[in-house]
Amino acid sequence: MKTSAQQLLSLLLLPLSAIAAPTGEIEARACSTVTVIFARGTTETPTLGTVIGPQFLAALKSSFGGSVTMNGVPYAADVPGFLKGGDPTGSKVMANMVSSALSSCPNTKLVISGYSQGGQLVHNAAKQLPAATTAKIAAAVIFGDPDNGSPVQGVPAAKTKIICHAGDNICQHGSMILMPHLTYGMDATAAAAFVKQVAGS
């Protein structure tokens, strides 16, 4: 029989396992019609950011009747990661999150998406996934893509939407954050309509 002290220790240790370093596993929950794995941009607040993540989620919920889950990738989102072509650890975590989501909810419409450095993570994660996994991705949507012009490996061009504003230096493979890079919230509705079109209801 456990002593009261042992029982207390067990209760104290239980939450620690729940907040271990992120591995990319998706928390068990009821499966949604649409599941989005989203990577925010450099210096944005975890985990969906503010420029487009929340707006895109709201637009998707409107399009799909609310049955949408968006999981933000937990990663540093710092400048060194951007300069490396996308945070390596975050890229791996995103790939793991895609695999986990499809394993947990094989019938969900899986969307991979990112903004700014998050777009780099989308490209990197897709390269790390086997073809059998990328074949199950319903759509890829990137806003302000630093890798503009490059395909998302394994995802057909018809299921990929890269949104880049005129004058966005990041989309021109630069490193300057100009006003056009901060206005992608206006594209949330169009992006959601694209997902609806290619993924179906």
Swiss-Prot record:
Active-site residues, as the UniProt record annotates them: S116 (nucleophile), D168, H181 (proton donor/acceptor)
Q: Which residues does UniProt assign to the signal peptide?
A: 1-20
**What does the entry give for GO biological process?**
carbohydrate catabolic process
Which cysteine pairs make disulfide bonds? C31-C105, C164-C171
Where along the sequence does the record put site: Transition state stabilizer?
Answer: Q117
What this chain does, per the entry, is described as:
Catalyzes the hydrolysis of complex carboxylic polyesters found in the cell wall of plants. Degrades cutin, a macromolecule that forms the structure of the plant cuticle. Allows pathogenic fungi to penetrate through the cuticular barrier into the host plant during the initial stage of fungal infection.
Protein name, UniProt field = Cutinase
Q: Which organism is it from?
A: Monilinia fructicola
Q: Gene name? A: CUT1
